């Protein structure tokens, strides 16, 4: 069930320029939340901005009843959210959306995150490792100071590689180039999970299809209702017979 509740901010930190990590006390959400789902946040006490902001659940701590969100300041809503302080309450709805589907038979998992696209992938990595999978994570960023989550993934036990567009840190080039190289080197995952810019996801899907590897993507869309009813956030998808919106 989708809940509409108030949650308290336990911590907030600017982890990279204009990118914030928040820890929220939300035991009601942690009970049912799955990696890949999101919450819908009201960013101010009045009705401006009118629409809630959809933010991925970055990490789920069921024992403590806490969730983490990782977000980038891109407009009025996220700017207001970044100004919140420890102890403030947030009006949220969630958990919403389809979570990632980790197949029981999958032994090797590849996770690819571009920019703020790493947001939903830490919870996925943690759950995959909990299930005994071997996990490899590829992170892409424009430059070194915008690389997010490298240490967090490593602490969980994943092997992590990083690509920066300008070559200021580790592999020089796009994360899709690093992804292609990793597959060509023979590291064949049973499943690939990705989140990031649409151009990145398109390239990932092309390479995964060519290599005949199952892949799932998490897409970022502007939202109104958050549940697909108003058709504001639906994406055009291809099924075996036709194209439809989901």
Placement of each model-derived feature along the sequence:
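Ferredoxin-reductase
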Residues: 2-86
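Short glycine/proline-enriched turns and hinge-like loops at secondary-structure junctions
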Residues: 19, 33-35, 50-51, 102-105, ...
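Active-site donor-binding loop signature of nucleotide-sugar glycosyltransferases
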Residues: 26, 165, 235
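Short, charged beta-turn/beta-strand-edge "cap" motif at the junction between a beta-strand
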Residues: 44-48, 94-99, 239
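FNR/FR-type flavoprotein reductase catalytic core
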Residues: 76-222
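Local cysteine-cluster metal-coordination motifs and their immediate loop/turn environment
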Residues: 198-199, 221-246
């Amino acid at each position: 069930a989708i809940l509409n509740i108030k949650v308290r901010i336990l911590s907030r930190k600017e982890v990279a320029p204009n990118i914030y990590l928040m820890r929220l006390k939300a035991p009601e959400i942690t009970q049912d939340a799955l990696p890949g789902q999101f919450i819908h946040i009201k960013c101010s006490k009045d009705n401006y901005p009118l629409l809630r902001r959809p933010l991925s659940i970055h990490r789920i701590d069921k024992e403590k009843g806490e969730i983490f969100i990782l977000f980038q300041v891109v407009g009025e809503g996220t700017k207001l959210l970044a100004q919140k302080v420890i102890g403030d309450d947030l009006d949220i709805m969630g958990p919403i959306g389809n979570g990632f589907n980790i197949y029981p038979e999958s032994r090797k998992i590849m996770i690819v995150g571009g920019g703020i696209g790493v947001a939903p992938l830490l919870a996925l990595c943690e759950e995959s490792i909990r299930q005994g999978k071997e996990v490899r994570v590829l992170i892409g960023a424009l430059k070194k100071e915008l690389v997010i989550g490298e240490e967090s993934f490593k602490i969980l036990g994943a092997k992590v590689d990083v690509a920066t567009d300008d070559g200021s840190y580790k592999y020089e080039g796009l994360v899709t180039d690093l992804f292609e190289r990793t597959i060509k080197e023979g590291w064949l995952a049973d499943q690939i999970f990705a989140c990031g810019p649409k151009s990145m996801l398109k390239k990932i899907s092309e390479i995964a299809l060519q290599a005949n590897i199952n892949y799932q993507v998490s897409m970022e869309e502007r939202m109104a209702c958050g549940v697909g009813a108003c058709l504001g956030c639906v994406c055009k998808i291809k099924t075996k017979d036709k194209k439809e919106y989901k």
